[in-house]
A protein has these predicted regions:
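N-terminal non-catalytic accessory region
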Residues: 1-151, 272-312
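Intrinsic-disorder/low-complexity loop/linker signature
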Residues: 26, 55, 183, 191-193, ...
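Alpha-helix C-cap/termination motif
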Residues: 48-51, 85, 109, 178, ...
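Alpha-helical scaffold elements lining the catalytic groove of polysaccharide deacetylases
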Residues: 70-73, 78, 189-198, 211
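Extended catalytic-interface subdomain
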Residues: 125, 129-206
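C-terminal subdomain of alpha/beta-hydrolase-fold enzymes, centered on the catalytic histidine
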Residues: 205-312
Length: 312
């Protein structure tokens, strides 16, 4: 163990944890199908001198559940365990993607125990990401931003199919019952208006305030985001850039009572100012030390190592 080094708790993103709780037969907690993404990153941290379960701890969690629930059940326990094993009263959180919302949910809460030195966020869309509207309200993403395979979208489509067949119900109904955490990752007020209707040559955006599909969890969390600085938690935000990323979704009126609450997704507008999953302005909603890397959502993990070597 590195003497004088602050212990790390790493929180992976959506689909970055797997166990019998999520899919029976998959065993104890692990990175599961995302091991090929996260294990190399953990090995890079180990090459910096950290040791797993000695001063490097992984917070696996049930990403199907609401973020507040996962924070209480999984993150608080992992932090308590890390403090007990190391004898340290402060640690650093390194969070990837959805994991950053768990980290924030803790450090911004009333239960915060003044035990986080640094909050390091990689690719977390702090105002979230438009494709999640499509999954939450329609059960699928009818459009694909790029010819490249998007791992997050691929896993999302497969998992939604799996549990809708398992529970013998339509996808949207199954999502709302068995994957409530997905509501916590649809765009919030701070993202801005993101659904638009096209008529002839004009584009009209649907105001977030008029939408039925909202993200109350993130709206509240972001209103209260300045408490992170007040609590003297050093914050670092690392984003990926240069990958085609969905910025807005084109919708048409839906006549279904079950699906597409605020419009059926039929198209999108892309930006290169993102990592393929998260746009820059969503990641950089928080105050902190900001870094932009020319990298995709997962490549940022590996390309961030020189930054982490400087700040840890």
């Amino acid at each position: 163990m590195r003497k004088g080094k602050t212990p790390i708790v790493f929180i992976p993103g959506l689909f970055g944890s797997m166990s019998n709780i999520i899919i029976p037969g998959t065993g104890n907690w692990s990175f599961g199908l995302s091991a090929f993404i996260y294990e190399p990153f953990i090995m890079m941290l180990e090459s910096m001198g950290y040791e797993r379960n000695k001063d490097l701890f992984i917070c696996f969690y049930d990403w199907r559940q609401r973020i507040v629930f996962s924070t209480q059940k999984y993150l608080l326990q992992t932090i308590a365990y890390a403090k007990k094993i190391t004898g340290c009263d402060k640690l650093n959180l390194i969070c990837h993607s959805m994991g950053g919302l768990l980290g924030r949910s803790y450090v911004q809460s009333d239960e915060y125990k003044n035990d986080v030195n640094q909050l390091i966020i990689l690719c977390t869309p702090n105002a979230e990401s438009p494709p999640n509207y499509s999954y939450w309200t329609g059960g699928s993403l009818p459009i694909h931003a790029s010819s490249k395979i998007n791992i997050v979208h691929f896993y999302m489509e497969q998992y939604i199919c799996y549990f809708s067949i398992l529970h013998k119900m339509n996808k949207v109904e199954a999502i709302h019952i068995y994957f409530p955490g997905l509501q916590d990752v649809i765009p919030c007020k701070d993202y801005g208006n993101y659904l638009f209707i096209k008529s002839d040559s004009s584009i009209t955006f649907l105001p977030y305030s008029k939408m039925k599909t909202k993200n109350p969890f993130l709206d509240i969390l972001n209103t209260n985001r300045f408490i992170i600085q007040k609590r003297n938690i050093e914050t670092t935000l690392i984003a990926g850039d240069g990958e085609e990323t969905t910025q807005y979704l084109q919708v048409v009126p839906s006549h279904s009572k079950l699906k597409w609450t605020d419009g059926k997704v039929v198209g999108d507008l892309l930006t290169k100012h993102g990592d393929g999953n998260a746009v820059l302005h969503s990641i950089f909603l928080l105050e902190g030390n900001k870094y932009v890397l020319h990298a995709s959502h997962n490549e940022v993990l590996y390309k961030s190592i020189p930054i982490l070597q400087k700040i840890l």
